[in-house]
Amino acid sequence: MNSAERCDLLIVGAGPAGMAAALAAAPTGMAITIVDDNIHPGGQIWRDGPGVTLPPLARQHRDALARHPNIRLLCGTRVVGLGGPAAPGDAPTLLLEDAGRGWAQHSQRLILCNGARELLLPFPGWTLPGVTG
């Protein structure tokens, strides 16, 4: 850990919920940081890639995040640990890392938008080709 940074609001997850939370909070003037381990915002729901056409709302949210002066988006960044608050009344400190460094991220507020996960429920024949459930 070689440094510490501070923001007013830290959002973990840049999927639809994380992007919406940041855009809803942005008019307050807070310094907002969003972290996500994916290389592009959108989460599991709004994935980016070859042959994928993003829904208009996904493109609007991405564009708005990129343009907003008090939103900092850190893609390719993972939460690797949790520490105590930096000051009384603060949220817990998150320990973050990207490809080049690790640091402590202090914030007054923390929103966890850690996203959707597929839930596999095994049933007879569930591994056969063409079967989904």
Model-inferred region functions:
Residues 2-7, 62-133:
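FAD-binding core/adjacent interface of flavoenzyme oxidoreductases
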